[in-house]
Curated annotation (Swiss-Prot):
Name of the molecule in the record: Alanine racemase 2
Enzyme class at the top of the EC tree: isomerase
Binding site for substrate: R138, M314
Family statement drawn from the similarity comment of this UniProt entry: Belongs to the alanine racemase family.
SMART domains in alphabetical order: Ala_racemase_C (SM01005)
Species of provenance: Oceanobacillus iheyensis (strain DSM 14371 / CIP 107618 / JCM 11309 / KCTC 3954 / HTE831)
Molecular function terms, GO-annotated: alanine racemase activity; pyridoxal phosphate binding
Entry keyword Isomerase: yes
Catalytic activity: L-alanine = D-alanine
NCBIfam families the UniProt entry points to: alr
HAMAP family (UniProt xref): Ala_racemase (MF_01201)
Length: 392
């Protein structure tokens, strides 16, 4: 039983791996370049507070999240490091952001004017980064003239225009053409903007670009997926050594032997072709163990693979352990983990789902406890029920 949960299903997050990955990126960039650790989406499912704390300990200079709510969560946890909200912030949130020294992204003149008004009313400094559109075509300032206009709209003794950034759409592609075009377009706007105002921090590199394009690192790089030990694309693995931080584990709750031609689970999509040993696991698609893995994926038991059989249910799922000797109720089943330790990589699971491992990590639900490990020992725990972080 996992102490802190009444169900033997959990994730382990290696803080050593997080630390290793941040250090690897710090060593990969010039010592003058800052490292921004992206911990949005609850740290890509790993736990934003815990990852942020470890990343800062390992040398990260700045943090980033997607929305103001995530930033407030970090501030409430006592994290006072520089912190950027990468996306849009509603005017209703400006007062809170300014008071908590949360840096905001601005990409329209209207937003700039709202920020200026809020800061001057509070008589407190608003920290701002401009978002530049260079080819992602999501949000951002598209022209150099518009960039200057917005910068002027922000002009106030209570507004600090701290930075400007863009986001690459195709940096994980082996063909650099589009990324180079974006970089050139971004630099054109920044060069023009800097003739009108001072911008201390300019940044454009995501994880893929940080690994593959050292000439684009500029003042700061933004590393998200790489901090968690996951590569944007396979070809980048030879350029930096990362360790997958998250593993997903469970234990069987029931093991039985069934005859040949026995149907398993909803829809009768799997029928045994021989007398088989079937183990039921207390994990299902409500936990992020996707139904798309039904009859497709494998898990690791006793260092061997066992196939997932039948449709994955909301709370339970079944595996065929016929070819794995002596499986018992106390045996740990690993759904994914660090591949160098003999486990199935999250990337493989994502490929079977027809998606990317970014999504696979984020899908792991809140009712699956996160156990934080250091040197193979549990040091912290986060789950629906707060208890001591002890495994057995």
């Amino acid at each position: 039983m996992i102490q802190g949960s009444y169900r033997d299903t959990w994730t382990e997050v290696s803080l050593d791996a997080i630390h290793h990955n941040v250090t690897a990126f710090k060593n990969h960039i010039d010592h003058h370049t800052k490292l921004m650790a992206v911990v949005k989406a609850d740290g890509y499912g790993h736990g934003a507070v815990e990852v942020a704390q470890e990343a800062l300990t390992a040398g990260a200079d700045y943090l980033a999240v997607a929305i103001l709510d995530e930033a407030i969560q970090l501030r409430d946890a006592g994290i006072d490091a520089p912190l950027l909200v990468l996306g849009y912030t509603h005017p209703d949130g400006l007062k809170t952001a300014i008071e908590q020294q949360i840096t905001l992204t601005v990409f329209t003149k209207e937003d700039a004017e709202q920020v200026k008004i809020a800061a001057e009313l509070l008589q407190k400094t608003a920290r701002i980064h401009l978002k530049i559109e260079s080819g992602m075509n999501r949000i951002g300032i598209a022209t150099k003239e518009e960039a200057v206009e917005i910068a002027k709209a922000l002009h106030s003794s209570f507004v600090m225009l701290e930075g400007a950034f863009t986001h690459f759409a195709d940096a994980d592609n082996t063909d650099p053409t589009y990324t180079e075009m974006q970089f050139h377009r971004f630099n054109q706007i920044i060069s023009h903007l800097r003739t009108h105002c001072h911008i201390p921090i300019v940044h454009c590199c995501n994880t893929a670009a940080t690994i593959a394009y050292p000439d684009m690192h500029l003042d700061m790089v933004r590393v998200g997926i790489g901090i968690y030990g996951l590569y944007p694309e396979t070809h980048l693995k030879e350029l930096i050594d990362l360790k997958q931080a998250m593993s997903l584990k469970t234990k069987p709750v029931y093991i039985k032997t069934v005859d040949q031609d026995t149907a398993i689970s909803y829809g009768l999509t799997f029928t045994t072709e021989r007398k088989s040993t079937i183990a039921t696991m207390p994990i299902g698609y409500a936990d992020g163990f996707s139904r798309l893995l039904s009859n497709r994926g494998d898990v690791i038991v006793h260092a061997g693979r066992a196939p997932i059989v039948g449709r994955i249910c909301m709370d339970q799922s079944m595996i065929d352990v016929t070819d794995v000797e002596n499986v018992g109720l106390d045996d740990v089943i690993t759904i994914f983990g660090e591949p160098t330790e003999g486990y199935i990589a999250m990337e493989e699971v994502a490929n079977l789902m027809g998606t990317i491992h970014y999504e696979t990590a984020c899908l792991i639900g809140k009712r699956v406890p996160r156990i934080y490990m250091r040197q193979s020992e549990a040091v912290n725990y986060k789950g629906l029920v707060e208890k001591e972080p002890v495994t057995s």
